[in-house]
């Protein structure tokens, strides 16, 4: 079966959540999927760096950045770290920077917008907890599928 979000919605509509269509694609891979890891933070990407420094094992990092459009939570250096450590992608309720460089990486990246300002570094935030992002409840260990048509979440691997 295809892992296109449209096909997954058709086949598994009762089992999935569709995130509100608020994200733009910034990574070199428009299509990505994997089990979810979560972070909740605000204008501080210290935990993003910490998490991406760990083995990704094909996971997708979902970052609840509070929807801030005042600074970026991911740039080219953290994108390269994600690739090096085997992350499939990121979905960020916030901004990214170095968007041209991110677009060349073999990584899925969805975010609200690009912003040139870097975040603060105060080691604040939480990891591995339930989130509410783009109208959906998201839990660590659920599965995320993203492509040109949107982002969906399921309690189990689909397809």
Swiss-Prot record:
UniProt binding sites for substrate: 75-78, 97
SUPFAM superfamilies assigned to the protein according to its UniProt record, in alphabetical order: RraA-like
First-level EC class: lyase
Family classification: Belongs to the class II aldolase/RraA-like family.
Xref: InterPro entries: RraA, RraA/RraA-like, RraA/RraA-like_sf
Catalytic function, reaction form: 4-hydroxy-4-methyl-2-oxoglutarate = 2 pyruvate; oxaloacetate + H(+) = pyruvate + CO2
Protein name from the UniProt record: Putative 4-hydroxy-4-methyl-2-oxoglutarate aldolase
Note accompanying the cofactor annotation: Divalent metal cation.
Keywords attached to this entry: Lyase, Metal-binding
Co-factor(s): a divalent metal cation
Keyword Lyase: yes
Disulfide partners: none
Cross-referenced PANTHER family: 4-HYDROXY-4-METHYL-2-OXOGLUTARATE ALDOLASE 3-RELATED (PTHR33254:SF4)
GO biological process: regulation of RNA metabolic process
Binding annotation for a divalent metal cation: 98
GO MF annotation, one: metal ion binding
């Amino acid at each position: 079966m295809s892992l296109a979000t449209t096909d997954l919605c058709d086949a598994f509509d009762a089992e999935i959540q569709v995130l509100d269509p608020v994200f733009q694609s910034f990574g070199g891979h428009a299509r990505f999927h994997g089990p979810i890891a979560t972070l909740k933070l605000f204008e501080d990407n210290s935990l993003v760096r910490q998490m991406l420094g760990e083995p990704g094992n094909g996971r997708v990092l979902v970052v609840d950045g509070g929807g801030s459009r005042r600074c970026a939570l991911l740039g080219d250096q953290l994108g390269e770290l994600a690739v090096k450590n085997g992350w499939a992608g990121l979905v960020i309720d916030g901004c990214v920077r170095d968007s041209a460089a991110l677009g060349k990486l073999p990584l899925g990246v969805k975010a609200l917008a690009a912003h040139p300002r870097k975040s603060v570094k105060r080691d604040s935030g939480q990891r591995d907890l339930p989130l509410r992002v783009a109208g959906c409840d998201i839990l660590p260990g659920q599965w995320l599928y993203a492509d040109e048509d949107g982002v969906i979440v399921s309690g189990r691997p689909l397809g």
